[in-house]
Amino acid sequence: MDRTRKNLMAFSIFIIGFAVYTVISVVLELFMGSGFDNVTIPEGAPENVVDMAKTFLLIVTGVMVLPQFYVGIKGACVAKNPNSSKGHIFWAGVLFVFALAGMGLTVLDMVNNGTSSDSFSMLIDGVIEAVFYFEFIVYARRVRNEY
């Protein structure tokens, strides 16, 4: 396997790692963290509003993580067999745009509400993910053009 395909394989593994990290962090926050412990339920709201919020967060996380797994697995398959389909480049581009949008929203939140350790960690995660998606796209296009 040449260097370009090895780099594509490495970035595919990193993207799968980010997807696993996202799932683990959300599950730990929901079931072990204190993210929902201090929520005040407004009057007239159903009693199970916190459970509904947790379910919604799990669904959003699942929808967010599925393209990451697809891009990572498909990129690894293309690194092994360059003649397979090329839909992973489009989805990596979509994830790259979402990472940029997330960084922009994090910076906007930091400007409006002040900085915190959570906002810095979210910003750093966004930068790292955006760089990995960009590099993934670069190497996937090189593999597509070479084979």
Q: What label would you give each PLM region?
A:
Residues G17-L66:
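Hydrophobic transmembrane helix segments
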Residues D2-M9, I41-T55, A79-K86, F90, ...:
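Juxtamembrane loop-transmembrane helix junctions in multi-pass integral membrane proteins
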Residues M1-F31, N48, R142-Y147:
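Cytosolic juxtamembrane helix and N-cap/initiation of the first transmembrane helix
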Residues A10-G17, Y21, A53-V63, G87-V97, ...:
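Physicochemical signature of membrane-embedded alpha-helices that form the seven-helix bundle of GPCRs
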Residues M64-I73, Y133-V143:
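Cytoplasm-facing ends of alpha-helical transmembrane segments in multi-pass membrane proteins
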Residues S12-F14, F98-G102, L108-R142:
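Alpha-helical membrane-associated segments of multi-pass integral membrane proteins
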Residues P67-F98:
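Loop-to-transmembrane helix junctions at the membrane interface
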